[in-house]
Amino acid sequence: MTCRTRFAPSPTGYLHIGGARTALYCWLEARHRGGQFVLRIEDTDRERSTQAAIDAILEAMEWLGLGYDEGPIYQTQRIARYQEVAEQLLAQGKAYYAYETREELDAMREAAMAKQEKPRYNGAAREQQLPYRDDPNRVIRFKNPLAGTVVFDDLIKGRIEIANSELDDMVIFRPDGYPTYNFAVVVDDWDMGITEVIRGDDHINNTPRQINIYEALGAPVPKFAHMPMILDEQGAKLSKRTGAADVMQYKDAGYLPHALINYLARLGWSHGDQELFSQQELLDLFDVKDVNSKAARLDMAKLGWVNQHYLKTDDPASIAPQLEYQLRKLGIDVAAGPAAADVVVALRERVQTLKEMAEKAVVWYQPLETYDEAAVIKHLKLGAEVPLGKAREMLAALNEWSVENVSAALHAAAAALELGMGKVAQPLRVAITGTQVSPDISQTVYLAGREGALKRIDAALIKIGAA
């Protein structure tokens, strides 16, 4: 049987990091097994579902590179199908109409709690065979088996058994004419031929209810894999403050999509001690059965390390558009400075994120207006005009502006003055960037451009008072 997985988010908010990991594992499992990956939008919560959330989910999936073979399929476009299946269960005596008011349902639950029993529906309408009538309280309930046990072998958690006596007759159609979650997902997964349901372990309690519906319909029951949650760095549940952010906030923070994919893959799954995986390695090695049954902790330091690895090793040209995105966010005209790929080469050993890279790169895209006072006192003092002047002379004489030629010119200036390279580089570094810290001096000067570099040297000479 062909493996078919699905990712089925509810569009009530953005795609957070836990949802992204679920989508990734579903995608990897399908791709690893040569199967199909389906995207379904579970939008039957009409009060909370929004088009903005749908757009955000689709944008995040595209950014992560998680392409789907079918979809997006919207539950709201399948209401007639859910009604058809509910009618089938009613006709077979496997479901029934119930009309209790909210007050009556509350009284049932309070009575159960008074007996120290689980608060739930008591099955009052189960055997009454009440006909359909126009009533604002009308629901359809599923006749859950009264005896026996639901048993399933979870691909991650192992064997799980739930007694049917623990389950009540749940609502499968609400008064508003919309299906409930537990009913709609069964019909969807059945119709879509889903063979593996991979989701968070907050759904484990739903699984026995859903299995009973599959069996009532005579539908094949898929395999289930329930992943443990992701905890924050202190071992508590993730919050927006501690990492449960919109996936696109990771883009804005300067992480590469494939770095985040690599990190998320390892957040609960492993292959020996290997930390870094190409996409092909993930596709070859991933098996949902190898996912750890214990909760994983978010580690932002490790994510930073993984991201820096890809900043260092990726083709600079492939990183350049993402650096330009970060620069534009800072209000920078990227046409007013060096090629972004050259900036990547200069800075990628010094940063962990593209956001950091962009912040450091601003100096080459805007006029230099501020200087670090300590750097000026130390390196733009009287006497510094000599190496600066010689460097300017050599740079101005270059026929072609390249890193190699800039380097040769600066070394020639140092040699002409019989100075160590540092005596030329440090005042020049302050002249070009206003600080004592920058990449290799040849790259630093090159990125300023011929005209920009000469103007900055002239400004530094004025500062020294030796123009």
Swiss-Prot record:
Binding site for ATP: K240
Species of origin: Xanthomonas campestris pv. campestris (strain B100)
One example GO MF annotation: tRNA binding
Name of protein: Glutamate--tRNA ligase
Cited Pfam families: Anticodon_2 (PF19269), tRNA-synt_1c (PF00749)
Subcellular location: Cytoplasm
Any one GO BP annotation for this protein: glutamyl-tRNA aminoacylation
Catalytic activity: tRNA(Glu) + L-glutamate + ATP = L-glutamyl-tRNA(Glu) + AMP + diphosphate
Motif, 'HIGH' region: chain positions: 9-19
